Amino acid sequence: SSGHTAGMGARFKVLPVERQGPLTYEAVGSSLSDQLPHGFRHVHVRELVSSEPSDLDRLGDALMSWQMHARCLKVQASGGVELGSTVSLRPSALPGVAADCMVVAVVDEPERTGFAYGTLARHPECGEEAFILERSAVGVHLSITAFSRPHTRIARLSGPVGRAVQTHFTRRYVDAMRKISAG
C-alpha cells in the first residue's frame, strides 16, 4: 500500500510513484509536508470557514465532490476526489485556459480531511496544491498550501499577473467554503 500512518486512526495516502508519470513536477505529495520544494512560489493560507466543529463531515463531503471548486471554476472531473482521479478546471474569465490536474494525495482522518492535486501537461503552471479541512475547538479551518512555477510560455510571460490570479483563486476557494458552510 502507498499509505502513510501518522498515529491512531490517521489515513494519509499518496499516489504511488508508478502512477506519477503524467505529472509535470517532482516532489509529489510535498504540499502536505512542512518542506515545500525550492524553486517554486509558495502559498499557504489557513482560514476559519465554520464556527461549528461538527461541520467537518459536511464540508469534507463538499470538498471531496469538487463543490468548492465548482463555485469558482468550470469543473470537468472524472468522478469524486480519489487518488489518481483527474479534473480540468476552467476559469470562465479566461476562455481557452484549462488547468488539468491529478489527485496525488488524499487525507481521511477523524479531525482532518482533504486532498492535494498536481499539475498535468495542459496546466499553465507546474506544481501542487493541497486543500485540507481541519476540526478544532473553535470550528473548521481550511488550509490551502501550494507550490508552483510557470509551465507554459504564456504563464512565464504573465509574471505578476499569474501570481495575482493564483491569489485571487485562493481567496475565492476560502469564500466558497464559507458559503457552503453557511448553507
Question: Predicted regions span which residues?
Answer:
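Beta-strand/loop substructures that line and gate deep hydrophobic ligand-binding cavities in soluble
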Residues: T119-A164
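Short, intrinsically disordered, mixed-charge
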Residues: G60-M68, R122, V138, D175, ...
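Intrinsically disordered, low-complexity proline-rich regions
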Residues: S1-H4, D55, D175, K179-I180
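Hydrophobic-ligand binding "helix-grip"
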Residues: A93-A137
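Hydrophobic side chains in beta-strands
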Residues: E47-V49, L89, A105, L133-R135, ...
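General beta-strand recognition
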Residues: S88, G114-A116, H141-S143
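Hydrophobic ligand-binding cavity/cleft-lining segments
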Residues: G3-L94
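A conserved amphipathic terminal alpha-helix motif
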Residues: R11-R19, R149-G183
